[in-house]
């Protein structure tokens, strides 16, 4: 009852919504230990998710951002009261008055928890210069991010922190909060362990390097946890679009026994790929390409991060890199390159917002050649020209 009383005293009706939100976040961070907090968020998320799926079974393959917005959060709580005890019921009731849904609140708590651990000091730089010059940055793979002793800052939080926390903060701010990829919340631990590519700005006047881009790289040995093979990303609602000539290109790699045969759906292709792959050490999944900065800087870091990672993967002997991409700048560029370098395998409008997400894969040796022959000016020009071409085609359809 003391906790409930403490919560109530922080949320008087006269407070502005921003102060109520801040008070709620501070309450959760100060009341629950990290593992308690993680267990609470996961358990209540799973509970509400299952409730919503029972109410709207036709949305079982849709994203969390769609599912959790199908019904007004306050109405959901009113009709289906919380069964996790009085304390959690009061907490969720308070959250429903301040946030659009539980996942929105979870994300804000995780962001605040990291920033609270590493408060900005008085001598921290107010602004970090991010020049568009390749020589100002270095990119490399870290095998076990949880064991790394590297400390960095981020453009949004110029206070040094362990690289695993900086990657997590970037994923939270740019992917989960920015793009509403709430599916990443229960899997946030993947941002804090395993193999990651990082792109860092060399320290200039700053005390520490600055993280400007990162990617999660998962080997075949953990393919059972790949996002590409999760139910949401491998089902019949995905339009299969793998071109016929891709089978010959894949066969040339000599990674399959027997060779892959033509498929009619994405789940069928996934099943055959997993069953017949023998060269498992040459295949990986690349996810969570997170970039910082303004619009121009983000485009530049998209280019440079891909270029440097693909070069490293090629040097290490990787042949195929699975991807899930929604970012138009990346997709526009891929449509301009040598057609055997990248293959789309399927697409789906996961968020019902008119934006297609594409599953596909890099042919890494060919992609390395593409990026070796491409500077940022070429990349930007190719993206711009493709965008103009698509716009012209769209207008032609409208007037046809």
Curated annotation (Swiss-Prot):
Record carries keyword S-adenosyl-L-methionine: yes
Coiled coil stretches, renumbered: none
Keyword field: Autoinducer synthesis, Quorum sensing, S-adenosyl-L-methionine, Transferase
Broad enzyme group: transferase
GO BP terms: quorum sensing
UniProt-recorded Gene Ontology molecular function terms: N-acyl homoserine lactone synthase activity
Chemical reaction(s) catalysed: a fatty acyl-[ACP] + S-adenosyl-L-methionine = an N-acyl-L-homoserine lactone + S-methyl-5'-thioadenosine + holo-[ACP] + H(+)
Annotated disulfide bonds: none
Top-level taxon in the UniProt lineage: Bacteria
Matching Pfam families: AHL_synthase (PF17327)
EC id: 2.3.1.184
Family: Belongs to the LuxM / VanM family.
Function field: Required for the synthesis of N-(3-hydroxyhexanoyl)homoserine lactone (3-hydroxy-C6-HSL) and N-hexanoylhomoserine lactone (C6-HSL).
Name under which the protein is recorded: Acyl-homoserine-lactone synthase VanM
Organism: Vibrio anguillarum
């Amino acid at each position: 009852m003391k906790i409930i009383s403490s919560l109530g005293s922080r949320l008087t009706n006269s407070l502005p919504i921003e102060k109520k939100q801040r008070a709620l976040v501070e309450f959760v961070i100060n009341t629950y230990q990290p593992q308690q907090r993680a267990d609470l968020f996961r358990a209540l998320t799973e509970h509400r998710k299952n409730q919503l799926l029972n109410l709207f079974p036709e949305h079982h393959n849709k994203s969390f951002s769609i599912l959790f917005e199908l019904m007004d959060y306050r109405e959901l709580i009113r009709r289906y009261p919380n069964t996790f005890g009085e304390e959690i019921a009061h907490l969720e009731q308070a959250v429903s008055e301040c946030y659009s849904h539980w996942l929105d609140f979870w994300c804000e708590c995780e962001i605040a928890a990291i920033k609270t651990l590493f408060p900005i000091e008085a001598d921290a730089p107010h602004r970090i210069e991010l020049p568009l010059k390749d020589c100002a940055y270095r990119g490399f793979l870290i095998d076990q991010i949880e064991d790394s002793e590297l400390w960095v800052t981020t453009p949004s939080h110029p206070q040094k922190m362990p690289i695993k926390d900086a990657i997590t903060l970037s994923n939270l701010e740019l992917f989960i909060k920015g793009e509403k990829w709430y599916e990443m919340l229960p899997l946030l631990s993947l941002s804090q362990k395993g193999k990651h590519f990082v792109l860092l700005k060399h320290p200039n006047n700053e005390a520490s390097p600055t993280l400007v881009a990162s990617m999660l790289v998962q080997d075949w040995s953990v393919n059972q946890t790949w996002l590409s093979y999760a139910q949401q990303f491998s089902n019949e609602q995905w339009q299969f679009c793998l071109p016929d000539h891709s089978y010959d290109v894949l066969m040339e790699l000599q990674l399959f026994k027997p060779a892959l045969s033509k498929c009619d759906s994405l789940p069928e292709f996934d099943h055959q790929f997993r069953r017949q792959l023998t060269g498992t050490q040459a295949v990986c999944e690349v996810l969570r390409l997170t970039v910082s900065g303004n619009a121009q800087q983000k485009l530049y870091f998209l280019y440079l991060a891909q270029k440097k990672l693909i070069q490293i993967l090629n040097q290490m002997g990787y042949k195929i890199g699975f991807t899930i991409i929604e970012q138009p700048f990346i997709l526009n560029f891929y449509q301009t390159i040598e057609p055997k370098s990248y293959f789309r395998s399927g697409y789906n409008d996961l968020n019902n917002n008119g934006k297609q997400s594409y599953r596909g894969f890099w042919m890494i040796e060919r992609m390395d050649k593409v990026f070796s022959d491409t500077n940022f000016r070429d990349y930007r020009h190719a993206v711009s020209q493709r965008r103009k071409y698509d716009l012209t085609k769209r207008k032609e359809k409208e007037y046809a």
